[in-house]
């Protein structure tokens, strides 16, 4: 097992090395954090890009394995298949396709924690370092808005988009007062489904039903206006791109309420189970 830039907090070794039988090569800029199931045979510590280049130069392999090329082709084809999807509420794949189309390579996305985070990790391609910040490890709900304010203070010339579920947004939405006071015209895109989507997803996967995860949302447009920000509501799939364009022209913080179809969560779980856990 070759682990590149791997942190045991993000994907516990027990999930892929439960019996401790894999030999591990650890490639990272820092020494490995050792535990019972993560004990590398070899550690390559240093700049990851340089280390991989040196390994490549010394490798006898001349072509990429066919199975990985095929997997990449499948993922690209799946990603592109949502380009013209007009279903509503919007699928998370389509939302992120449009977001990636709109955001520049150097612009910054700050992800909150929830079901949307799983989709961002799967669907949002990054072209430059530190342009997609995700709270893993402790997985802190409510990070997106204050994180976006901080990013905008540091990089005022860049577009900064906070992406959050409705649950995570309401945990720290009062920081929109801070955003306004500090003159940071961030934009928050809310994946709105009136529930704690990731917990519901896990409950459905494990138990086939869910409980105690649904709630009522405020009117996010009026909520924004009450804080002297600007609010938008996506009413159809074709709305999202022009709303993003308009929101980033504003001089005040903005909130975009975008209904999401999280029936895609269970479909993804079933697809991954069938493909990789046979």
Residue ranges and their predicted role:
Residues 39-52, 175-192, 270-271:
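A short alpha/beta connector and helix-capping loop motif
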Residues 73-151, 157:
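Active-site diphosphate/adenylate-binding microenvironment
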Residues 1-71:
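Glycine-rich, acidic loop regions that bind phosphate or pyrophosphate groups
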Residues 34-42, 130-134, 171, 200-212:
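Short beta-alpha connecting loops at secondary-structure transitions
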Residues 1-9, 118-196:
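Thiamine diphosphate
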Residues 12-17, 204-207, 237-278:
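Glycine/aspartate-rich loop-and-adjacent alpha/beta segment that forms the canonical ThDP
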Residues 43, 51, 57, 204-243:
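Conserved thiamine diphosphate
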């Amino acid at each position: 097992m070759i682990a590149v830039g791997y942190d045991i907090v993000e994907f516990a070794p027990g999930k892929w090395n439960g019996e401790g039988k894999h030999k591990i090569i650890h490639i990272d800029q820092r020494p490995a954090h050792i535990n019972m199931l993560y004990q590398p045979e070899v550690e390559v510590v240093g700049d990851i890009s340089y280390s991989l280049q040196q390994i490549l130069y010394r490798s006898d392999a001349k072509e990429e394995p066919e199975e990985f090329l095929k997997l990449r082709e499948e993922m690209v084809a799946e990603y592109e298949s949502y380009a013209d999807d007009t279903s509503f509420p919007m699928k998370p794949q389509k939302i992120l396709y449009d977001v990636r189309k709109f955001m520049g390579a150097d612009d910054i996305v700050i992800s909150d924690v929830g079901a949307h985070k799983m989709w961002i990790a799967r669907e949002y391609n990054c072209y430059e370092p530190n342009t997609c910040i995700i709270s893993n490890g402790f997985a802190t709900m409510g990070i997106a808005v204050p994180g976006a304010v901080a990013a905008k203070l540091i990089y005022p010339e860049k577009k900064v988009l906070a992406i959050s579920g409705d649950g995570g947004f309401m945990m720290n939405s009062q920081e929109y007062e801070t955003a306004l006071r500090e003159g940071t015209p961030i934009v928050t895109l809310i994946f709105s489904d009136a529930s704690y989507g990731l917990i519901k997803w896990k409950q459905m996967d494990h138990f086939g039903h869910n409980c105690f995860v649904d709630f009522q949302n405020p009117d996010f447009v009026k909520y924004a206006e009450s804080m002297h920000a600007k609010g938008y509501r996506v009413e159809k799939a074709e709305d999202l791109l022009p709303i993003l364009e308009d929101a980033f022209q504003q001089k005040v913080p903005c909130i975009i309420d975008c209904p999401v179809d999280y029936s895609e969560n269970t479909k993804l779980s079933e697809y991954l189970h069938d493909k990789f856990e046979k």
